[in-house]
Amino acid sequence: LMGWYSEVARDLNKIPDAISHFESELANARAEVKLKGNVERAAAEMPGIVEQRFAQLQEIEAILNYLNIECRRLRSSFFKKYLENYQRALSSRDVEKYVDGEADVVDYEKIINEFALLRNKWLGLLKGLDQKQWQITNVVKLRVAGMEDATL
């Protein structure tokens, strides 16, 4: 099974599909943050849930890093073009400004921004799972202390 990182690295047109996939997975994962039902079962399921969702976050991080690398490469090619082909001498600062305005660079940075937002949503999910683990631990401690009626 090839992951989304490989798909995106092979074909940048797969980015919308990757975003849709991870948004859909995020919606499913949000249900896993809720603590309800049997505490023992919830505790037993937590390691697998955390491993799966953390691995997905790592794939998003890898795609984001790949996009940043490609954007730097694109910026570099425009930078070189301006330095070599412009009639008058330009300062590096001038060239930076021109490169910042290139449509391809702007489009890339928008995609990077969208992926960064997706990554941040997943970081929020992982924080929620951390809180769930903490709550499970507290409920178990209450039960050990004799407060059997701790309900969720």
Which sequence ranges carry the predicted segments?
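Long amphipathic alpha-helical coiled-coil segments
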Residues: 68-76, 107-142
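Catalytic phosphate/metal-binding cores of nucleic-acid and nucleotide-processing enzymes, i.e., regions
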Residues: 61, 81, 123
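Terminal, low-complexity, charged helical segments
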Residues: 1, 31, 38, 150-151
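Acidic, low-complexity, intrinsically disordered peripheral segments
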Residues: 143-152
